[in-house]
Design a protein with these regions (language model features):
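Short alpha-helical segments and helix-capping/turn motifs at coil-helix boundaries
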Residues: 32-37, 96, 120-126
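A gly/proline- and charged-residue-enriched helix-loop-helix capping module
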Residues: 68-117
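Short glycine-enriched loops at secondary-structure junctions
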Residues: 55-56, 88-92, 141, 182
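Active-site cofactor/substrate anionic-group-binding motifs, chiefly glycine-
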Residues: 39-88
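General beta-strand structural signal in soluble alpha/beta enzymes
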Residues: 29, 86-87, 111, 137, ...
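An N-cap/entry alpha-helix motif that binds or orients negatively charged groups
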Residues: 1-44
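Alpha/beta enzyme core
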Residues: 64, 74-75, 103-105, 115-198
Length: 198
């Protein structure tokens, strides 16, 4: 469901990734290379996390529904030593099943909430708390999706003050996914976000 607008986002991203080169430096102490890192007090095997996906059957395949996909995703990421973000959407079961999978993994996953109205966000935050998630995210770039723009009560983009109010509802780190500009990154920081995903 990505590549909105001109439809070339995935292609342009692929082209840009082809420009990235690893610069090898052999003037270092000879030892085992490690990609391990720590985030929010947890250890991970690599700085690579699986992104949030919802409405799996509608967008991708009949092989999985949201519930079975989230279970497989969370389990596989945990076995690989990384974490997964889980998705959200119009169907409440998307968020519920993601949080259930995170709970089954002892909170090792990051439920991702769409930028709904505050009352819906509060309900979804309660699900993340029941799941004992170690962090919670919001995919703020979803604000442009037609179903959010036309939602009643209003949903979508958030001001710094609105984002801060959401941060204050949480007792775990809050990640803002879908930051597109340096200015937006500074706004997320001002609101109290613990991290961003560009």
């Amino acid at each position: 469901p990505g590549a909105k607008g001109t439809g070339d986002v995935a292609i342009r991203n692929f082209d840009k990734w082809r420009d990235v080169r690893v610069n090898m430096d052999t003037l270092v102490e000879k030892k085992q290379i490690s990609t391990d890192f720590e985030l929010f007090g947890k250890e991970f095997s690599a700085p690579i996390f699986a992104g949030p996906i919802g409405a799996v059957r509608m967008h991708y395949s009949d092989e999985y529904d949201d519930r079975s996909f989230n279970k497989v995703l969370i389990k596989a990421c945990n076995e690989a030593g990384i974490a997964a973000f889980t998705g959200d959407g119009m169907d409440d079961d998307q968020m519920v099943s993601g949080c259930e999978a995170v709970k089954e993994a002892d909170g090792h996953g990051i439920p991702t909430i769409k930028p709904w109205n505050l009352e819906m966000i509060k309900k979804k935050i309660e699900l993340t708390k029941e799941a004992n998630a170690f962090a919670v995210a919001m995919d703020i770039d979803a604000a442009g999706l037609p179903f959010l723009k036309n939602f009643t009560p209003p949903a979508g983009s958030k001001s710094v003050e609105q984002l801060r109010e959401i941060v204050e509802l949480l007792d775990v780190p809050f990640i803002v996914k879908g930051i597109m500009t340096p200015k937006a990154a500074l706004k997320a920081k001002e609101a109290g976000a613990s991290a961003i995903v560009v």
